[in-house]
């Protein structure tokens, strides 16, 4: 049986993270830690979960992107303010997590959409959904500036 939230939230996820290159608010290159989905899955099993998987959800036309609003920037580039959704299964628990389709902290425009970005967004949705619902990796988001 999977350990409870209060136990899992105490696991330091940082040593299990990989790093990706990004830029800070001033454009300075930085490295940002992220927990790979496969490592997240293994940690769940190591902490008592028997069955762990996620399913990318499809929209009404069979695609993996959900659109919330079409927006044009000053150069007339278009984005649908896209997001993805996954259904996460951990033993007898099932929950859904939505995640915006982003390129780091940048908007993904229609002319830069690709399958890798969509797949990465599904993986991020899984990891963040696990953190919210189980506590595993939750501390990785404690300093996130979600309201900016």
Question: PLM features: what roles do these ranges have?
Answer:
Residues 1-148:
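Polyanion-binding surfaces on beta-sheet-dominated domains and ring/shell assemblies
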């Amino acid at each position: 049986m999977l350990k409870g939230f209060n136990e899992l939230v105490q696991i330091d996820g940082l040593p299990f993270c990989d790093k990706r290159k990004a830029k800070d608010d001033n454009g300075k290159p930085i490295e940002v830690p992220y927990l790979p989905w496969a490592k997240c899955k293994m940690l769940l099993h190591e902490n008592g979960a028997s069955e762990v998987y996620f399913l990318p959800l499809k929209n009404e036309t069979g695609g993996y992107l959900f659109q919330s609003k079409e927006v044009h920037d000053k150069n007339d580039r278009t984005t649908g303010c896209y997001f993805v959704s996954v259904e996460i299964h951990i033993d007898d628990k099932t929950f859904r997590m939505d995640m915006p389709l982003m390129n780091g902290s940048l908007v993904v425009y229609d002319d830069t959409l690709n399958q890798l970005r969509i797949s990465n967004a599904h993986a991020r949705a899984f990891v963040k959904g696990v953190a919210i619902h189980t506590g595993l990796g939750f501390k990785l988001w404690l300093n996130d500036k979600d309201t900016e």
